Amino acid sequence: MSRLKKLYTEEIRKTLQDKFQYENVMQIPVLKKIVISMGLAEAAKDKNLFQAHLEELAVISGQKPLVTRAKNSIAGFKLREGQGIGAKVTLRGIRMYDFMDRFCNIVSPRIRDFRGFSCKGDGRGCYSLGLDDQQIFPEVDLDRVKRSQGMNITWVTTAQTDAECLTLLECMGLRFKKAQ
């Protein structure tokens, strides 16, 4: 069992139960999945660069990324139908908890001038953030990075409100900006 999963079952569930006064234990929010995605439209023209970014995402996440492809051709963007324009990985189970643990304890402190993430969710119990650079992950070999590439990370929970979601993620170790 992962360290974060053990922390969730032993402490975080009790904290959430006390704070939000759930009637049933099944109402307590759970982290369902983490989705990591990269938009690689510029890299789509250069196959070597596209492949390098796919390998970086695989190293960061621990599993092979799914290539997202263009649905339609758009001549103005020099885009062809079926051309790879991005990549995404969906983490569940032990890999999800391991990634969350690494992200909170190793990656977040490496962000320059980090004072916490924004406190704005989507209103439905999910939280998303964007990173400007993949080089903050210690798994990425800095000598092999050809171009800086950002990514989006989305935490999907069973929470009904933003407050529940943010409390769950904060208890798991994600740092948010203090509201003024």
UniProtKB/Swiss-Prot annotation:
InterPro entries: Ribosomal_uL5, Ribosomal_uL5_bac-type, Ribosomal_uL5_C, Ribosomal_uL5_CS, Ribosomal_uL5_dom_sf, Ribosomal_uL5_N
GO molecular function, one term: structural constituent of ribosome
Tagged with keyword Cytoplasm: no
Domain of life from the UniProt record: Bacteria
SUPFAM superfamilies: RL5-like
Single Gene Ontology BP annotation: translation
Annotated GO CC locations: ribonucleoprotein complex; ribosome
Subunit: Part of the 50S ribosomal subunit; part of the 5S rRNA/L5/L18/L25 subcomplex. Contacts the 5S rRNA and the P site tRNA. Forms a bridge to the 30S subunit in the 70S ribosome.
NCBIfam families registered for this protein in UniProt: PRK00010.1 (NF000585)
Known function: This is one of the proteins that bind and probably mediate the attachment of the 5S RNA into the large ribosomal subunit, where it forms part of the central protuberance. In the 70S ribosome it contacts protein S13 of the 30S subunit (bridge B1b), connecting the 2 subunits; this bridge is implicated in subunit movement. Contacts the P site tRNA; the 5S rRNA and some of its associated proteins might help stabilize positioning of ribosome-bound tRNAs.
Protein name (Swiss-Prot/TrEMBL): Large ribosomal subunit protein uL5
Species annotation: Chlamydia trachomatis serovar L2 (strain ATCC VR-902B / DSM 19102 / 434/Bu)
Gene encoding the protein: rplE
